Amino acid sequence: MTLRSFLILLLSSIVLAGCSSVPESVTSVEWQAHEQRLETIDNFQATGKLGYIGPDQRQSLNFFWKHSSALSQLRLTTLLGQTALKLTITPQGATVETYDDQVLSARDANQLIYRLTGLMMPVDHLPDWLLGLPTDADSFQLSPTNTLQALDKQIGLNDWNIAYQRYGDIEWHEQTLPLPNKLRLSTSDVKINLVITKWNITQ
């Protein structure tokens, strides 16, 4: 597998983990209050490390995710700081730039991922999932501290699970807000570990 093919597979795996429908469930008042606070976040930046484990590939990368209503951007870099892949999504369209200077564009991110992987999938909910919101999930579970503990979803023939393994507190609007800082995305043959080392809520 070439590096470019691996990065496309990695990107599609991350995107796969961002799209899924939430059933009606009984939740606590504390969770509902936490969920409402998360839903007010429109602009954020997340920095961290990503580990990918597949059937024939293992890779460690740094990531930087920047999201606002006008721009969403994911940049993956090697441990030496070289940009491996950058995905940019705006209201006008989506673009992927690869380490070998190839640029691929489409009217929206769904079309771009389809062109790269042959899979049609929505990507609109990925920022919410990173924050710990169960937007459009098949099912979800809460932790004893009323944060999101796990999500389950089926996309095509694959059953995906997102486990929120650790949270960290940040100060936001003079209150303490727990945000995910360790997640595992997994299906039958792929595991993606995310460690978020820094959150920046910018509004």
UniProtKB/Swiss-Prot annotation:
Membrane topology according to the record: Lipid-anchor
Main localization, broad class: membrane
Cellular component per GO, a single term: cell outer membrane
Keywords from the named record: Cell outer membrane, Chaperone, Lipoprotein, Membrane, Palmitate, Protein transport, Signal, Transport
Signal peptide: 1-18
Cross-referenced InterPro entries: LolA/LolB/LppX, OM_lipoprot_LolB
Lipid-binding residues (covalent, S-diacylglycerol cysteine): C19
Quaternary context: Monomer.
HAMAP family: LolB
Role: Plays a critical role in the incorporation of lipoproteins in the outer membrane after they are released by the LolA protein.
Family label: Belongs to the LolB family.
Protein name (Swiss-Prot/TrEMBL): Outer-membrane lipoprotein LolB
Native organism: Vibrio campbellii (strain ATCC BAA-1116)
Taxonomic path: Bacteria, Pseudomonadati, Pseudomonadota, Gammaproteobacteria, Vibrionales
Name of the encoding gene: lolB
